[in-house]
């Protein structure tokens, strides 16, 4: 059963200034400790702004799809395995995530569905 669909579109340039912050306060609020550790290893501002934009967009899409749960962004951990983004919020909910990139924008989509085999 589909629980919700969320979509978010962001301009990467909105995250360029945030990626240059020396105190990283935005990144620390948005990312989990594991995500932040990965972010901190990035050297180029373009990589950092893209990382923040993808994570913001995915977390926004997830929030919109499961807004009845009211998850905090800092509790949503985005992982990437085999070129697929993943996030686990509840064993009974499967999140299907998709990200599309262009030179200026990132679009994220989340389809949240109840997993019938885990009721």
UniProtKB/Swiss-Prot annotation:
Mg(2+) binds at residues 8, 60. Transmembrane segments: none annotated. The keyword ATP-binding does not apply. Keywords: Cytoplasm, Fatty acid biosynthesis, Fatty acid metabolism, Lipid biosynthesis, Lipid metabolism, Magnesium, Metal-binding, Transferase. It holds the Pfam family ACPS. It comes from the Bacteria. The keyword Coiled coil does not apply. It is an enzyme of class 2 (transferase). Transfers the 4'-phosphopantetheine moiety from coenzyme A to a Ser of acyl-carrier-protein. Belongs to the P-Pant transferase superfamily. AcpS family. HAMAP family: AcpS. This is Holo-[acyl-carrier-protein] synthase. It comes from Mycoplasma pneumoniae (strain ATCC 29342 / M129 / Subtype 1).
């Amino acid at each position: 059963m589909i629980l919700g669909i969320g979509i978010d579109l962001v301009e990467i340039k909105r995250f360029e200034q945030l990626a240059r912050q020396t105190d990283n306060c935005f990144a620390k609020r948005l990312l989990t400790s594991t995500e932040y550790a990965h972010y901190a290893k990035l050297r180029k501002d373009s990589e950092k702004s893209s990382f923040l934009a993808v994570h913001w967009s995915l977390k926004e899409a997830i929030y919109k799809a499961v807004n009845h749960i009211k998850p905090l962004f800092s509790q949503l951990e985005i992982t990437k395995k085999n070129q697929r983004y993943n996030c686990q919020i509840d064993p009974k909910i499967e999140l299907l995530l998709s990200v599309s990139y262009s030179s200026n924008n990132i679009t994220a989509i989340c389809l949240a569905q109840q997993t019938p085999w885990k009721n």
